[in-house]
Amino acid sequence: AAAAAVGSRSKAVIPVDLFGQMAPIEAVRAEIPTLPLIEDAAQSIGASRMIDGKKVMAGEGATIGTFSFFPSKNLGGYGDGGMMVTQDEAIALRLKRLRVHGGAKQYFHDEVGYNSRLDALQAAVLVAKLPHLSHWSAGRRANAAYYDSAFADIPEIVTPYIDPANESIFNQYTIRVERRDALQAFLKEKGIGSAIYYPLPLHLQPCFQYLGYREGQCPVAEAAAKSVLSIPVFPELTSAQLDEVVGTVRAFYGR
């Protein structure tokens, strides 16, 4: 439980939306009502969740919502970029200061900030792409549904679980599979792309070893890192391409 990890130095809680599906932010808020929530919505722009009978969009229900416009995201720019949203006016004003060296007035700095402005080129690309986001998300959901059906009879594959309260935008279509590395090699041999998100859990990353974490402390994350594989789900996939992916995966498992 998240509450067990909260200590005297805790400043905020960061629920992470993974693979296009929102985290249960209302449950986190109920469990830890005294701390602000910063929703990591980098992979979920356009996703939604029903909370108390209301449709809440990704980034909307937290104290701050953060989005990524990295080119690989569902709404990607031409290069790096991102956005933070909030309904708190004081936080919004501070974020605006921080993005431009910590000052509201040029050459006057109220605090130490950053050079984090979205450049005009990225903004132009995103403005052109934004009207298509809903259509692209629908295409991803349709492709995901096709995969769900096509893999339903293969016990070696676990398709993505989608919380009934959520509408995912499938930033990735990530399956858990047996013989993951062999399957990925087989797909590559057939000219089909795939990716592992993510091969090493955070607690085992070299940069965090000073904290004393060791293998076996987060068994679910470790098992996932050894079994997950993301296959193509982008909305431009043709029926023939979908069939090729499905047929190749099924052939690997002798189906």
Where in the sequence are the language-model features?
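Active-site phosphate-binding strand-loop segment of PLP-dependent enzymes
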Residues: 1-77, 83-85, 230
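PLP-dependent aminotransferase class I/II
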Residues: 4, 12-16, 21, 25-27, ...
